[in-house]
Structures are given as structure tokens and as C-alpha cells.
Amino acid sequence: MKRLACVLLALTVTLSGVIVLRTVRFTSRQITVPPAGEMRVDTAALLDRLANAIQFRTISSLDPARAANEEFERFHEFLSEAFPQVRTQLKREIIGGHSLLYSWPGRDRALKPVLLMAHMDVVPAVDGGWRHAPFSGAIADGYVWGRGAMDDKSSLMAILEAVEHLLRDGFVPARTIYLAFGHDEEVGGHRGAAKIAQLLRARDVQLEFVLDEGLNVVDGIIPGITAPVALVGIAEKGYVSLRLAVETAGGHSSVPPARTAIGIISRALHRLETTRFRSRLSGPTRRMFEFLGPEMNWLNKLALANLWLFAPFIKKQMAQSPLTNAAIRTTLAPTLFHAGVADNVLPANASAVVNLRLLPGDTIAAVVAQVRRVISEPRIKITPLPLQMEASPVSEVATPGFELIQRTTHQIVPEALLAPALLVAATDSRHYAGLTKNIFRFLPITVGPEDTRRYHGTDERIAARDYERLVRFYAQLIRNAEP
């Protein structure tokens, strides 16, 4: 017994030593950089042009015939008038009907180009519930309001403002800069970004990196961190929706069978909602902990420095919040349900749609197979809907592209920490995977807990200070891209 106690004590001391040593070696990944150079801008004019851009109802649709074609054409004309230097000095191509590709030739053709992305299309918006009408572009209370203020006309306009400013200053980049603006990102990007990427591949273009919209500077959202955090997406989740359908005899509601069509589908949905996909601390989430863990208090730092031991506890904690749960597993959510024609008629048919967002490492085939196993109901027909996207590859952080974004962010948003992370939504950037391994998703505007609902929701807005800073960010990024 005494010998066993000595062995246990030795193991405890050794384990404690390993934990403490790993924690001590868990040092900061933040960097110190000189401040950005001065950039004089006319803030009122910047805001006015963004407000005007928001007024165009550039709503995309899966059906090209229903897209706002005239609005996109009018928006193109507006951009040409608003940015005369861009119009005269950059080559512009219209791709896939309404998407735009600008080419800004660099001095050194041996350097790989950089591609900056945004999209001009927006999701629909109803007038009710908005403080300012969704397509008013109102400038009020220190914000620009309207659909597209956050997603994603602010990014598009800020890129063009930055390039226009640099052109006026006579700046010529060392490497070629591409500006790619899709017109159907909200419905998959297959006629816009996909066509642009196809064109660049045909021209044998290989990119140094791609920067698209994505994660933001979050404030008050990450537990254990009081400072703002700039989250740079290094991967995004996959996407697939499944239609679950069943056919029965139907009949009169006074003589129901043991299992009705609605009951069969409802039972399947209950099984799916109560059977979660396996949780994993995947590459992007681990990288985020590597960058943020050293900035936390000792206990949090100790846990994150020793994921080999504390990963189960951390995953359990993350699973408590929908926001963090989405970062550790493939998620499933019922989004549509169709059944019934009257209150006294048993519907012969019932169907539902469930939307899945795939964690990197999971595949569409694998998650569909798991859905079948969980439902375990041969009467239900499971059909994947056409819009499908596998999870993206994970971009590395030890690359010039990520380091450039990190350096620029610390120059423009010096009060923020920075960390790579997983984007749980989908962007047009995935279409460029064949042109570079370095794809990043980051829009440096500040988002608090109350702002997350504004994406695709009511009262979408961007702070005037954030928009001016966004213009400075893109201008500094282009300058920093010099070798």
C-alpha cells in the first residue's frame, strides 16, 4: 500500500509538472507593429457613397429571371461614377451577367497576385420592424443603416474607396491586385464567384492569398477575454439541406392510424435534434485557443495549454452555447415543414427540410449516412437539395498572407487581440480553393452581442467609425503587400 501511494504521488507530481511546464511555455502569439501611416479621408463623403450604395435593391435569386437585373446594372453605373480613378486605371470585366472582376497590374509579374473579395447582392428585407427603412441608406446616430451595411456592401465599397485613394496618390502595387465582386453570393455564388474563379484558372493565375468577408472584431462575446478580438476565418463549414418526405394513405382524422405522416416526420426530427454529431476541437478552433489562451487568466490558460487533458471539459462547456457549439461539431436544424390541408383530414404526405453545417473533416456523404442511421425509418425518403458545399480546407497561419492580415489589423485596430477561427457560415471564397491554399475570411468591423442578429435581420447597420477604419484597413493591407 505504501509503495502504491509513492507511485501515485510520483505520477501526480510528474503530471502536475507537465501541466505547469506546458502552461509556462504557452506564450503570446500577438505581435507589436508600428502604427499605420496617416491617411486623410473625407468621412462625410465616404458615408454618403456607402449610403447611396445601400439604396440599390440588389437582391439575388436562385432563379436568374427573378434577380434584380436592372438594379445590378444601375449599381454598376453608380460604381463607375463614384470611383473615376478605378474606372480609368483598372481593367473591369463583367462575369456571369453581373459580377465584376477588376485587375490592377503590379510592377513585378513574378509575384503572386492578391485577390480581395466582396459581394454586391443582398438578401430580401421587409419594411416592418426597422428603425430606418431597409433600403434607405439612412445616416443617423453615428451609423449607416440598411440592408448590406454589414453584409456586404460595406466591404465592397471600402475596397474601392481604398483603391481609389491609392490611385489618386499615384501608388502602383508591386504585385497584381484583383478585386472580385460577386452578384449571387447569397444563393451560392455559382454564376458569379465560381465563374470568376473559372476564368482565372483558365488564365493560369495562382494567388498568394484571398481575403473575403467573414468573421469580425468581436467585443464582449468571447468568455475570459475583455479586449476586442479580431477573428480571422481560416476555414468555413460545409452546407447541405436534406428533404425528409413520407407518403401514407391519409384519410379521415376520426380514425387515425398508429403513425400518421406528420407523426412519422415529427418523430424523425425529434431523433435528429436529440442526437448530436460528435464534437471535435478541429484545426481552426485549436488555432484560436493557441492565440487566445495565453491572453486569459491562469486557470483558463492552464486548461487551453493542456488540451490533451482538458479537451472533454472544454467541449462540454462550449456545447452549452449555440454560438460556441457550432464551432465544435456539425450542426443540424429543421428549417421547413409541410403537411396538411384541413383540421379534420389526415395528410397523405408530409415533408420537412433540415439544414446541416459541416465541420471541417466531415463530408456530406458521411453526415447523410448518419442522418439515415439516426432516423432509422424506411418509410422516409431522404433527398439532398441541390445547393451543397463540402467544408473548406483549413488555411495555415504560418503563411505570408495570414501574417500580413495580422500585421495590418494590429496597425488599424491596435486595441484588439487577433486569432484564427472557424467561420460557421458560407462565403464565395470557397470557389477559389483551386487558386490558392491561403483563403481568409475577415471583415474588421466591431460586433457586439446585440449585433449578431443584424446579419440578415432587421436594423442592419455599420458604425461610421468602423466604416472609416475599414477603408483604412484595405488601403494599409495593399500597402503592406509590398515585398
Predicted regions mapped to residue ranges:
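N-terminal Sec-pathway targeting helices
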Residues: 1-13
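Acidic/His- and Gly-rich active-site-bordering loop/insert found
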Residues: 12-147, 168-173, 354
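Acidic-enriched catalytic cores of C-N bond-cleaving enzymes acting on peptides and small amides
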Residues: 25-33, 200-209, 216-227, 232-241, ...
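An extended, acidic, His-containing surface patch that forms the Zn2+-binding/catalytic region
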Residues: 41, 92, 103, 109-110, ...
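Sec-exported extracytoplasmic/periplasmic mature domains
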Residues: 51, 55-59, 80-88, 161-168, ...
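Acidic/histidine-rich, surface-exposed loop or edge segments in extracytoplasmic proteins
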Residues: 51-65, 245-248, 383-390
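Acidic/histidine-rich catalytic neighborhood of metal-dependent amide-processing enzymes
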Residues: 143-144, 148-231
